[in-house]
Swiss-Prot record:
Located on the platform of the 30S subunit, it bridges several disparate RNA helices of the 16S rRNA. Forms part of the Shine-Dalgarno cleft in the 70S ribosome. Disulfide bonds: none annotated. GO terms for molecular function: rRNA binding; structural constituent of ribosome. PANTHER family: 40S RIBOSOMAL PROTEIN S14/30S RIBOSOMAL PROTEIN S11. One of its GO terms (cellular component) is ribosome. Belongs to the universal ribosomal protein uS11 family. Part of the 30S ribosomal subunit. Interacts with proteins S7 and S18. Binds to IF-3. One of its GO terms (biological process) is translation. The keyword Repeat does not apply. InterPro entries: Ribosomal_uS11, Ribosomal_uS11_bac-type, Ribosomal_uS11_CS, Ribosomal_uS11_sf. This is Small ribosomal subunit protein uS11. Keywords: Ribonucleoprotein, Ribosomal protein, RNA-binding, rRNA-binding. The lineage of its organism: Bacteria, Pseudomonadati, Pseudomonadota, Betaproteobacteria, Burkholderiales. The keyword rRNA-binding applies.
């Protein structure tokens, strides 16, 4: 005999709570292969995020400044819906999407209050991988 459908599963689905935050931090991780943009509030809780690969770019096109720009626009639009007006930008990594992603956030109308470079630099720690020979 078949059981009646359980409505408890439908009751567990919650509506997404919309946060209203005026200031936040944009973490931009620009590697040589991809660019990841995460916009958080001051406490570090993620409001929105986007990547070059998630924006539809694959392979070597992910590592272009244009792909980083598209990803930054996608993350910025969701952040604006959360009420973000001012952003502090923290850039990590040597990738080609560093500058273009900051410009894209600025062009969306978000005021950028501070730009920090938080790229980790070793104080002569681990030995780096050997040079690539082509």
């Amino acid at each position: 005999m078949a059981k009646a459908p359980n409505n408890a599963a439908a009751a567990r689905v919650r509506k997404k709570v919309k946060k209203n935050v005026a200031e936040g931090i944009a973490h931009i991780h620009a590697s040589f292969n991809n660019t990841i943009i995460t916009i958080t509030d001051r406490q570090g809780n993620a409001l929105s995020w986007a990547t070059s690969g998630g924006a539809g770019f694959k392979g070597s096109r992910k590592s272009t400044p244009f792909a980083a720009q598209v990803a930054a626009e996608a993350a910025g639009k969701v952040a604006i819906e959360c009420g973000i007006k001012n952003l502090e930008v923290r850039i990590k990594g040597p990738g080609p999407g560093r500058e273009s992603s900051v410009r894209a956030l600025n062009n969306l109308g978000i005021k950028i209050t501070q730009i920090q470079d938080v790229t980790p630099v070793p104080h002569n720690g681990c030995r780096p991988p050997k040079r690539r020979r082509i």
